[in-house]
From Swiss-Prot:
The keyword Cell membrane does not apply. This is NADH-ubiquinone oxidoreductase chain 4. One of its GO terms (cellular component) is respiratory chain complex I. One of its GO terms (biological process) is electron transport coupled proton transport. The lineage of its organism: Eukaryota, Metazoa, Ecdysozoa, Nematoda, Chromadorea. It holds the Pfam family Proton_antipo_M. Changing S26G: In strain: PB306. Signal peptide: none annotated. Belongs to the complex I subunit 4 family. The keyword Membrane applies.
Length: 409
């Protein structure tokens, strides 16, 4: 039903993208089906759902973005991300992983509004280069065997850490996260939507691919990194005055929570991590879309100036509240279901983990509620274009589409 709703929107606004959507969707109805010879293979429902999410995000960008150059860059980036989800060996995975950086860099440098965009591009390139060269080191040390390997290989703990460093940068985990707020603040709205909704999923999907090589003995290191990212990142959100920076740090906390789910290495933890990927993809895309609409109308991203802004439109206020409540994991959103599964898994492993997760949830709910109350209370503006906000309706439906569970169970 949701797919038909979205396709009807595409048919109404951009008929050529309706054709593109239907052609791509016809490829996605097959599971365990290789339509690219030895190089591309659909081997999991998880990656099929991520590809569907990519197409939904592209759809809202196609409908809402007026700049044709940004549209072309968005289509290139989504195509690269789709190919990233379905390669059959590590070398192709790495190639498309690095290739995804260039459209975002062009968007930031070409269409950013402030001179600080050069500094944020330096951060992005430095982190990408610093964290990706170790991957090439492992590649050469393996005597090029990674070219033909279908993800199931046995390596030492040290080699796994080096291999996962490039994916950790795209998560990003807390200590490799400094490029993300800078890139979000300087990027145009379209680039921020793609960066939060798609590019962060490349790191999680890549880590999910190599997870079979993770040593069970050293999980404590990853659990510690995940908890530090959750707690410190959520406290960073509390002290932000820029709404876009707050949404960026919120992505850092959610990705740390996702890392906690992944390293448990159980079937239910994999299911919860994929659902959390989907929930964060839809939610963060809408967060940056709404913040971008606020910026385009008022000329500011400061939370102080958001006071009463969304109360000028009832539809906008409801949508804003729904998105940020979903971001904090309120039922019946997909975020709640995935986070509930993560909490259940962590309680089975150690009761003491619940204290850390409780702190994370309290702080996370606080900054989401603070942003909602600060934006809805007070005297409202009257110059807001409500029509554009209606484009986000399909993503809201997907964000609360709890029937994703039926795919896994």
């Amino acid at each position: 039903m949701l797919e038909f709703l979205f396709i009807s929107l595409l048919w109404l606004f951009k008929p050529i993208y309706f054709l593109l959507f239907t052609v791509m969707f016809s490829f996605l109805i097959f599971n365990n089906f290789s339509w690219g010879g030895l190089f591309l293979v659909l081997d999991s429902y998880s990656f099929i759902l991520l590809i569907v999410m990519s197409l939904f995000i592209l759809g809202i960008i196609v409908i809402s973005e007026k700049n044709n150059n940004l549209l072309i860059l968005s289509e290139i980036l989504v195509f690269i991300c789709i190919i990233f989800f379905i390669p059959s060996n590590m070398m192709m995975l790495y190639m498309f992983f690095e290739l995804s950086m260039f459209p975002i860099l062009v968007m930031i440098l070409g269409y950013g509004s402030q001179i600080e965009k050069i500094n944020s591009s330096y951060y992005l390139m430095f982190y990408a280069a610093f964290c990706s060269f170790p991957f090439l080191f492992v590649y050469f040390k393996s005597n090029f065997l990674l070219v033909f390997t279908y993800y199931n290989f046995v390596i030492s703990w040290e080699m796994f850490f080096i291999l996962s460093l490039s994916f950790m940068m795209k998560f990003p985990i807390y200590f490799l996260h400094l490029w993300l707020p800078k890139a979000h603040v300087e990027a145009p709205t379209t680039a921020s939507m793609l960066l939060a909704g798609l590019l962060l999923k490349l790191g999680t999907a890549g880590f999910l691919r190599i997870l079979g090589s993770l040593s069970f003995v050293h999980n404590n290191v990853w659990i510690l990194i995940a908890f530090l990212g959750m707690i410190l990142g959520s406290f960073c959100c509390v002290f932000q005055s820029d709404s876009k920076a707050l949404a960026a740090y919120s992505s850092v906390t959610h990705m740390s929570f996702l890392l906690l789910s992944l390293v448990f290495i159980t079937m239910s933890s994999k299911i919860s991590s994929v659902m959390l990927m989907l929930a964060h993809g839809y939610t963060s895309t809408l967060m940056f879309y709404l913040i971008g609409e606020f910026y385009h109308t008022s000329g500011s991203r400061m939370i102080y100036f958001m006071s009463s802004f969304f109360s000028s439109s009832m539809i906008m206020g409801i949508l804003f509240s729904v998105v940020f409540l979903s971001n904090s994991g309120v039922p019946p959103s997909l975020s709640f279901l995935s986070e509930f599964l993560v909490i259940s898994n962590s309680m089975l492993i150690s009761k003491s983990m619940f204290v850390m997760i409780f702190i994370y949830f309290v702080v996370s709910f606080y900054y989401s509620l603070f942003l909602i109350t600060s934006s809805l209370m007070g005297k409202g503006y009257h110059n807001f274009n409500t029509w554009n906000v209606g484009f986000s309706a399909p993503l809201v439906l997907m964000m609360y589409n709890v029937f994703w569970l039926s795919v896994f169970y």
